[in-house]
Amino acid sequence: MNPRGNPSKMPTQIVLNRRPAAPARPQTTFTSLSQYHMYNTASTSSAPPPPPNQNFGQIREAIRTTQPTTVQLPPDCKLVEYTWQENGESRTVLIPMSNDSTEDDVRSALPQSVLESINQHQNQLRQGNAQAVHYYQKHQNPISHEKPIMVNPRQYKRIIKRREMRQKMEDSGRLPLERQKYMHESRRQHALKRRRTGGRFDANAEAAAASSEPSISSAAPSPPKAPRAPTTYAMIRPATSHPPVNIPKAPAMTYRPVQEEKKSIERISKAQMFTIPKRQQ
């Protein structure tokens, strides 16, 4: 009631329409290359659903304007947000679909221009990933030392024959695959056996002493020998043999020994000394 008692001068009430609330967070997500966010924003109003064309126009208007816009959907409908990248910019399309719609249904509802841009972007991503993987494998893998060694054909035949013979001996059991003793181990055992009176080698005495004095190490089971890995060989390849080069030989030059030259000079000088000059008429 107005304190002055004048009902005509009461203040007028102004009601402001609040902005609609932001859409709820996605409850379902499609697992694909692009982002499919499902918005189950079923309207609680009893108003009949708008026609498809009008609904799609409202969705496009909601994308263009920055202010929030309310979209009424039937209870058995959901709003799908499809986001993709085009020319470095993020683009979004809202499509009303039924609750039992699949990813293929959403793709079929997209415009043809959108599908072409998405396929082009996915192809660029695949090419970039392939180049990155190739670069990673090329530069991150350790450098292999198994490069073929160039040998001459005669060495190649000899090496291949020796490898085949060794492989046959390993398969037949003539070459054991157990680790052989190192040189320092065998020398130590030999030195222990020579520690007897007079420094003589006595293997039987050491074996008897070892059997008479049992130790913890002898009672314990001996560890199994580490098996030797199969023999691995380096890669070899015969070098291409070049044809022999025919170099023209120089004509052979004959050289007379020095003694023969001296004898010939002496013979000539003696003949000149004993020659009788002709009489001059």
From Swiss-Prot:
InterPro entries xrefs: NFYA
Subunit: Forms a heterotrimeric transcription factor complex (nfya-2-NF-Y complex) composed of nfya-2, nfyb-1 and nfyc-1. Interacts with the nfyb-1 and nfyc-1 dimer; the interaction is required for subsequent binding to the 5'-CCAAT-3' box motif in DNA. Does not interact with either nfyb-1 or nfyc-1 in their monomeric form.
Keywords noted in UniProt: DNA-binding, Nucleus, Repressor, Transcription, Transcription regulation
Function: Component of the sequence-specific heterotrimeric transcription factor (nfya-2-NF-Y) which specifically recognizes a 5'-CCAAT-3' box motif found in the promoters of its target genes to regulate their expression and control cellular identity in particular tissue types. In association with the components in the nfya-2-NF-Y complex, may repress the expression of the T-box transcription factor tbx-2 throughout larval development, which most likely restricts its expression to certain tissues.
Bias-annotated ranges (Basic residues): 189-198
Gene3D superfamilies given in the database record: 6.10.250.2430
Disruption phenotype: RNAi-mediated knockdown results in weak ectopic expression of tbx-2 in seam cells of the head in young adults.
PROSITE patterns referenced in this protein's UniProt entry, alphabetically: NFYA_HAP2_2
One matching Pfam family: CBFB_NFYA
GO cellular component annotations of the record: CCAAT-binding factor complex; nucleus
Protein's cellular compartments: Nucleus
UniProt region (Disordered), positions on chain: 1-27, 163-261
Motif Subunit association domain (SAD), residue range(s) on this chain: 150-173
Homology family: Belongs to the NFYA/HAP2 subunit family.
Organism expressing this protein natively: Caenorhabditis elegans
Expression sites (tissue/organ): Highly expressed in certain parts of the gonads. Expressed in the spermatheca, intestine and in some neurons in the head. Not expressed in the intestine, the hypodermis, body wall muscle surrounding the pseudocoelomic space, secretory cells in the pharyngeal terminal bulb wall, in the small ganglia surrounding the pharynx and in the neurons running anteriorly to the sensory organs in the head.
Bias type Basic and acidic residues, positions: 166-188
Disulfide partners: none
GO MF, any single term: DNA-binding transcription factor activity, RNA polymerase II-specific
Name of the protein in its database record: Nuclear transcription factor Y subunit nfya-2
Domain of life of the native organism: Eukaryota
UniProt DNA-binding residue ranges: 180-204
GO aspect biological process, one term: tissue development
Residue ranges, compositional bias (Low complexity): 204-220
